[in-house]
Amino acid sequence: MKKQLKFKLLAITLISILATIGIGCDRIFTKPFQLPASAKQEPWPIQTGLRAGILRDNIPTVNRIVLVPDEATFLAAIQKWNLKGNWPILIEDKKYAPMFLQRFQPEEIVRLPSIKPQRPKNQKLQQLMLNSAAAAWNATDTQTLKAKWTQLGWEPPGVVITSENDPARSAAVALAAAHGQPLVFLEDNFGKPNDTLNNTQWKNLQLAVTKAVESTGFFYSQLADPIDTITIVRQLAVKYQSPEKPDEQLAVTDGLGRHPNGERWAAVGWIYGSEVRSIYQAMCAIFLDTETAMLYDSYPKEGNWGKYEMEEAASGLKTIGLNVEVVQKPESSLEKWRSLASKPWTFDLILMNSKGYPKSFQVGNGDASVEDLPKLQFPAAIHMIHSWSAAAPDDKNTVAGRWLENGAYAYIGSVNEPFLSAFIPPKLMVDRLKRGAPFLIAARQLESPPWKVATIGDPLMSIAKPRPRIPPTQQPM
């Protein structure tokens, strides 16, 4: 009897030890950056947002801002990012850096002197950029970076494409580092931002982008595989000639990321411009939280216009904690708009329903001009239901151009006459945002053939819960 009791006690002890070992092994072999199996049942836009959310949850933001005088110092500074924390780094100027500072409100501001020499001896620029992006993941180069991702269970949600000869190139490094994406280079000439590509140029761009994504070695050809976004960070044309209707132009950011039959395999965002502004746009997308919103509706309540009403969208944004201001008919008018625009706006998110042309937009009972657009005190993400606003986004005398010049870091607008149905109704867009879909993806007609809505900004930027911050003392430079 005593022997049986001893045997039972021994068996219970052994089972307990094995269970403890099993739990310990689970902890050892758990991959902290892996997308949970349950998430893979979600639609691909939600999966993409959840991937970005994994990094927000696991890599805290250090409550500091680093200001640098030039690009070389920026690339040196970004190599201090790591898996224990990262922080905004901007090239100091008199316009965009102050806007970011005022909105971010850091506990610590660090100004770095210009580094000498500007680049390590015998190191090529592309290699420096790749190594700088890898350093944020405690890796030294592309090879060790991929090994680190495998170790952590991380699957990149997208690819960043830039040119080593483009002033926006350092923003590409930041987006690759922050979102855990491969960085690849595309050096050909594909036009200037206000241009229209002809059929030959467009086919060349499509092929070049697809080859660039293929070169990473990650699966990309279907939605909900790892690569579902492309971030182009360099100069190229905003639109291309429609193959079916030569007098119509389609949005390059909607035409890319598709198979020859038009089926989508990725959503595309685009950042271009000076090194100062492009880095600013990248840092806004990575680090800024969304707490306030302006919803301006100039549409009548009747007919199809009524489907684009803003009240339900406003209610949805309030449920995720945003402070929302709504202006709609009969209140929306030229007088009301000019009153609102008479002082700088502090809204993080701006959703607007309008009609018009590249240089004018309807605000209720009349047309406002580009000169009536408000200054921005804080950076903003903007969705503009309107025709032609993004036809020439590098021209500050157009609607999109002025919003971007004023400090918008993400912008959704049309390059041509798109018709109302090209845009997602605000309620549906907000429903997608609430579920975690990134901003640019939430605004897309995801099943339609290539059309006319351009998406400018980081395609992984989400309207998400505030990022956790840690004090600078926990992560010294």
Name each region found by the language model.
Residues 73-75, 81, 95-108, 116-477:
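Cysteine-dependent hydrolase recognition
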Residues 55-68, 153-154, 158-162:
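Glycine-rich loop/turn
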Residues 11-20:
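Bacterial N-terminal signal peptides
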Residues 66-67, 90, 109-112, 350-352:
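Short, hydrophobic beta-strand segments that form beta-sheet elements in well-ordered domains
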Residues 28-64, 128-143:
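N-terminal low-complexity, Pro/Thr/Ser-rich intrinsically disordered segments
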